[in-house]
Swiss-Prot record:
Name the UniProt record assigns to this protein: Genetic interactor of prohibitins 3, mitochondrial
Keyword Nucleus assigned: no
GO molecular-function terms, A-Z: GTP binding
Species: Lodderomyces elongisporus (strain ATCC 11503 / CBS 2605 / JCM 1781 / NBRC 1676 / NRRL YB-4239) (Yeast)
Transit peptide: 1-17
Organism ancestry: Eukaryota, Fungi, Dikarya, Ascomycota, Saccharomycotina
Transmembrane segment boundaries: none
Keywords: Mitochondrion, Transit peptide
SUPFAM superfamilies: P-loop containing nucleoside triphosphate hydrolases
Compartmental location: Mitochondrion
Purpose: May be involved in the mitochondrial lipid metabolism.
Domain CP-type G: 185-380
Family, similarity comment: Belongs to the TRAFAC class YlqF/YawG GTPase family. GEP3 subfamily.
Amino acid sequence: MISRLIHSKHYLTLFRQNSSIAIPLLYSLELRCRSCGIKVQDKNKDEPGYYIKPVKLLNDSKTFSEQTQKLGLVVAADAPNILQNPIKKRPLDEAYDKLISKMSQSDKDLLINDFTLFGQPKYKDSKELETIPKNDKGETVKEVVNKIYTVKPDETSVECMRCRNIQYQSSYKMTDENFPISEMEQVLQNLPRASTAPLVYLFNANDFPMGINPNIFKFRNPKDIYFIMTKTDNLVADIKNKFNKSAILHEYTKNFVSDYLGIKYGVPKQNIFLSSSLKGWKLDELHRFIPDGSYIIGNTNCGKSTMIKSLMLNEELQNKKEQVRHVPFNTVSKIKDKFKQQFYQKVGPGVSYLPGFTRDIIPLNIGLKTVYDVPGFSSSPKIHYLYESIKEPKIIHRLIKGEKTFAKGYNGAQYKSFKGPQVLCFEGLGYLQLPKDCLFQIRNVTNFKIHAFSNIDKAAKLAQNIPPSLANDFAIGNHSLFSQFDKYLVPPFYGSIELVFENFGYIHIKPIGAKQSNELMKLYLYPGLQSIIRQPIINYITKTPTGFDKYGNALMKYDPVYKSEFALKRFRGGEEYQPLFSRLIPCVEDIEKFVGGGGGGAVAAAGAAAGAAETNIVDGNDAQGLAQSLRSQEYLQLNQFLKRRAKYDESYYMDASNKYDFWVE
């Protein structure tokens, strides 16, 4: 019957016209993991998609113990579902049950201290038990509410062992097979009806605009893509009403994102939505915003599955709201909280901070709409290496969470000052080398723990053998800074910038005092971690001091901030266009030219120069000459990479008029 249906012309017409019906039908023909979407199998536990088949689905009559012995392992959470033979009770439990069965209901409640119902005394004696309001089925109000807020089990729902081990044991192997991550082009080409299906593109507020791959516009017209910024609560505070400050900041942020996507790519403003699944912002509006039959796409860890699950939960809660309208809030509140927790665990796609958790397309119904959760993509081929190297899963979870801009990144937030040639270590995942004798204020809008070293040579030596006292300041184990890390030059800049780390947040960098040299900052990144620099995002999402008073006069540095006029910066095109961000410049290794061999590139050369000067291995003139040669080599690499007439060197003067001349998007 199914074979005839699939090959019939009627079915093919249905498939073309309504994918939201056809795709779930096709997926229902195969047993798949509800968390990651992979097709499951129970033959080989070393192959992807392995799961433990419930005993009731097996055709033989072996007992539970024999089945589990054959399978080789037992999952405690599965036991209630697959248990066939009852477990014999202990004598102590049998005696307890016998005594309990002889007690009245009031004595049972007294035993467990259950004195209250809806905040009032439940009953004083057994006669009062008969006066508790019940419906025609003999159910109390509390029992009815519990029944309403019960997650109904799906008999056909299964989970593969990879997903169960991640969820219950935090156990995983970060391999390409277990966590497949493809490039965007490959993911889009694998979508059914790839040329016409609606696309909803999610991107992360923590690292904007890194989460937007411009190649998406090779597959769709900008007017046909819907963009959703996730984790927006990290940029603006919670929204209470349209008149408070948070709502105004939310509007500023939406205008900024709309300006950027509209000017850069031609995306209409009505195709942009700002959301926070954690805070549950405007979920009803978000549901209306997403077209029926949409494919939800985006980078890994951008929050696709979390958003979908929040929409599913909101739909369930709305359906139940009318049923408990007359029940006191205190009665419903705790039961509803328990329901939410169970819903997140048992319904919808799995949610994880690990990249590549979703392994195949998962069709999901949200009200009358059907959407498809699509595996995330990445432009970094070494992303598995990055996450596999991090010591503990809880560290990944902490770093992915990000920080709040209006707690750590605004102009009045706490900062720390550092002076070059100090090196800032971001838990071993990145090292930022500051130019010599230059002073900077650093605001940390990530969850990185920052440790400062006096120079790059000392940082490299300690990284090879991390002492126990600093172990908690490193997300990875011992490593070789000179040979393992990717090296980059930070393009020249004027004024404040932000160093953005993909998925993790950003570091606000503000130069202080007179500029001592044109030496470039250098950033060393662990393989798989990507970074850019950008203009301070705070200038675009809230009004900031202009540095001029109300008469247009420039203020002095020592003038109080309140004398300044405040203005909101807008992202503009045309002659007023300024690049929002810049890529970093790859640093080519050429150590032999400077120190006569030894390997390790310009990073090692810089460390050698700093170490030699401090330990008097060479005299001051030789160390100074070596450092100058290194800077000249870096200037040459910068100019060659940009292929521009403007030549950056020691004498180049930067100001507000040319501060973006060396930025490349």
